[in-house]
Amino acid sequence: MKFSRFKSRNTNYYTNTIITTETQLNNSNNNNFNNTTTINHFNKIHQQQSNNNNNNNNNNNNNNNNNNFINFSNHTNNINNNIDNRSDKKRKLNCMEKSNISSSSPYTLTSTPSSSSSSSSCESSLLNLNNEKLIEDKIISFSNENVGNIKIISMSDSKFTIYNSNNTDYKELLFWKVWRNFFLKNEILFHQRLYNLYSSFEFNDLKSLLNFQYREYLQHITFSFYFDEPLSLINFKNNNNYNNNNIFPNSVKKITFGYSFNQAINQNSFSPNSSSLTSLEFGESFNQDIQINSLPPSLTCLKFGKNFNCPLSLGVLPLSGNLKSISFGLSYNQPIQYIPNGVEKLKIGGNSVYNNKNNNVNNKNNNKINKYPNSIKIFKFDKYFNDEIMVGTIPNSVLKVKFGVQFNREISMEQIPCSVTEIDFGLKWNQPLNEFSLPKNGNLKSIIFSHFFNQQINANCLPDGLTHLKFGPLYSKEINLNHLPSSIEILMFHNSFQSLNLLKNYNNLNNKKIQIIYYN
């Protein structure tokens, strides 16, 4: 926190900066009263100030007894004290004895209780502080005295700022208090270096994880390609430092299994008390049943590999409401019926969608349909998906649809829910568009055509309400801007499109402003 000095225009000395803190104390009768503490910051005091202090201001003393807090400014042109020099010196000496602070300081601290306090207390107390560091120390010490607010007042412009123990300025003051301590700063930097080195680490086996010297710094654990051990400490029962529920440190937020991992997941696999694990990613080979209540309730992201195809019964996926993202791989063809409410992002493989056609006589699950919660907002298809999209495949709550790399099928407005606001077509998608391809309700705002798209954009094939339109690097068709919806605001093309000069009627848009962006 900085203590500013303000130069007065009419005098050759500096005006005051006042810092006031409001705190609640108990008097001898156990009644609450306000104690106001003011710090007056003097840089240079004019030689005549001591003479002016003896002039007038009797009325100010009477008003001060009725205020909950008093700001002492000592600005010599505006505020004069009517206190006898001898009594003033006596108060200073009494209070300096209490504070053990030298009287030679240019900084003063004055404390005045309200009129409800006991008569034995001083009307005012003056403490001298040696420098700005002592002022910071005093303000920090207020946190132990039930301080409510800290008020900084500039007498030059009558502006003031109020700080409290919860705001960023107060916390910044505490931060610098620690950071300026040489020992504490070195300790912080030392642990920061260890965190940077070991917060993310790869292990080949559980033994190396259990014996890892810097376990407490781990946040992301990755197991190597060949790792395939049961997640149990049975083989380490002679190790007294760990119990069966502490394979992973409580600091870990993400676990990524390698390609070969294919072990059962049970209630002993993860610590039931773990509240930090938020992301779990299985490898391509994983295809094991998961017991109910085995996955940590703190999970927010869950990703299965390409070969996973085990049914998920009710209770397998955490019902805590924290789970926000689930991703299934290519092989998954089980009915999706128990996705917890609260999941916002869902990625499914091609086989899961194919089973919903209900026309595969060899599929035992063809009489079951997927059930999605209304919380799903982002719907993604696996990169290998390239089947026809059946009506109802995409949930009606979805806002964004993203197709996979291989998808290259015609689409119709019946396949895309009216709730969708953004569509991202896959890398290979290159199908013609007509007036029945996309929803016309006006909710669709953004379309991204990817790498291979190169179809003519005709009139009325894009819906009204569309604002953002992006074309891939291979697009080389002429675009008549009059054929685009009047709502278009941003057009994005690859740099190669700019040299083709294929934008028509750009100057005949009737004062309509379209931002054209070229990217690399």
UniProtKB/Swiss-Prot annotation:
- Amino acid composition bias (Low complexity), ranges on this chain: 51-84
The answer, when asked if Repeat is one of the entry's keywords, is yes
Task: Name the PANTHER family on file.
Answer: FNIP REPEAT-CONTAINING PROTEIN, FNIP REPEAT-CONTAINING PROTEIN-RELATED
The keyword GTP-binding is assigned to this record: no
- What are the FNIP repeat spans here? 242-285, 286-331, 332-406, 453-496
* Official protein name in the record: FNIP repeat-containing protein DDB_G0274063/DDB_G0272642
Q: Which organism is it from?
A: Dictyostelium discoideum
Question: What keywords are annotated for this sequence in UniProt?
Answer: Repeat
What are the boundaries of the region Disordered? 47-86, 100-121
Signal peptide range in chain numbering: none
Under the heading InterPro entries, the entry gives: FNIP, STK_FNIP-Repeat
